[in-house]
A protein has these predicted regions:
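Bacterial N-terminal signal peptides
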Residues: 2-14
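Short hydrophobic/aromatic-rich motifs at helix boundaries and adjacent loops
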Residues: 5, 38-41, 74, 222-223, ...
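Compositionally biased non-globular segments, especially hydrophobic aliphatic-rich helices
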Residues: 11, 15-22, 222
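Binuclear metal-dependent hydrolase catalytic cores
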Residues: 19-201, 213, 278-308
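Residue-level structural signal for beta-strand termini and adjacent loop
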Residues: 182, 206-207
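Cap/insert and terminal regions of metallo-dependent hydrolase folds
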Residues: 200, 207-298
Length: 310
């Protein structure tokens, strides 16, 4: 398939750091640890590892099963120090404590994490409180501090007002991470854009269609948009799910309006999997660029797309 989306399924290959040779262009890659949602149907919950110059650096969400995928792919966690959480539903955060534990047991020196996630509202705690509940001094897994590498956490609770705008949260050595508020029913949620030199990928997280204008602002001209696709077009999914997720036709419209290079559909549900052709057709009503469905253990090499090219 022509286009800037280069996909390869990694079953047994290790995802380990490799040296950045002199003169080699900077690389940005995504490993899909989990492409599923809250249902148990053979996929891990939403989770991704982002590699910078071949080195795993960023964990984005940590759904149930992500821990197993990390082991299957023999991912070296030694330099993963940035954690991005789109929201605090279980299917996006259930394996976070397991990740912290595994990282501590495979590292010699102290680990300093930067963790980002939404502020709290209603039934949902702010991210700093969530992390403290898991691994703080009086947390559920406080025992973790008694063995393994020493871990410290700098947690930033991101504003959740829809008019906040795009916010830059990391800017170092060519790596830029930005976020914007989205809408996922009553659950505070954000989307992230990761840019490394001239390459960029955007993760929508779970979101309904009411705040796609914010996603467009964040994703404008990105090389790859990873959009969670958990429902069919109305009326083919339960009506209440449209208050949580964006249907395919709106995904296609959003991708077109954003001017992204490629689209990767993740967080799929069984009925979406069974209707791939219809989903693709609906998306292509608006978006003419490359579209793929994510699978667990898929590895995506981000290729920069010249402005206006497909």
């Amino acid at each position: 398939m022509k286009g800037p989306l280069i996909l390869s399924l990694m079953i047994a290959a290790a995802v380990t750091p490799r040296a950045q040779a002199s003169g080699v262009k900077p690389s940005l890659e995504v490993v899909v640890l989990g492409s599923g949602g809250p249902r148990a149907f053979g996929r891990a919950g939403s989770s991704y590892i982002v590699l910078i110059d071949g080195k795993p650096r960023i964990l984005l969400d940590a759904g149930p099963g992500a821990f197993v995928r990390i082991g299957e792919l023999n991912i070296d966690l030694g330099q993963v120090d940035i954690v991005l959480l789109t929201h605090l539903h279980i299917d996006h955060s259930g394996d976070l404590a397991a990740f912290f534990n595994a990282r501590a047991l495979t590292s010699d020196g102290p680990i300093k994490y930067r963790v980002f996630g939404p502020d709290g509202a209603g039934l949902f705690p702010k991210t700093s409180r969530f992390v403290d509940w898991l691994v703080g001094e009086n947390g559920l897994f406080a025992y973790q501090k008694s063995f393994g590498a020493q871990e410290t956490f700098s947690v930033r609770d991101l504003a959740i007002e829809l008019n906040t705008g795009v916010t830059k949260i990391v800017d170092e050595n060519g790596l830029i991470v930005e976020e914007i508020v989205t809408h996922h029913g009553d659950c505070p949620s954000v989307a992230y854009r990761i840019t490394y030199h001239d390459k960029s990928v955007v993760f929508s997280g779970d979101m309904d269609a009411s705040a796609v204008s914010n996603l467009v602002r964040l994703a404008t001209s990105a090389d790859l948009l990873v959009f969670n696709c958990a429902v069919l077009d109305p009326p083919d999914s339960p009506s209440q799910l449209y208050e949580l997720h964006t249907p395919p036709k709106k995904i296609g419209e959003t991708a077109k309006e954003s001017g992204v290079g490629s689209l990767l559909l993740s967080h799929t549900a069984p009925d979406v999997e069974e209707s791939k052709n219809a989903v693709m057709k609906s998306i292509h009503t608006f978006f003419t660029g490359p579209v793929e469905f994510a699978t667990d253990r898929m590895r995506v090499q981000i290729t920069h797309r010249p402005q206006g090219a497909h």
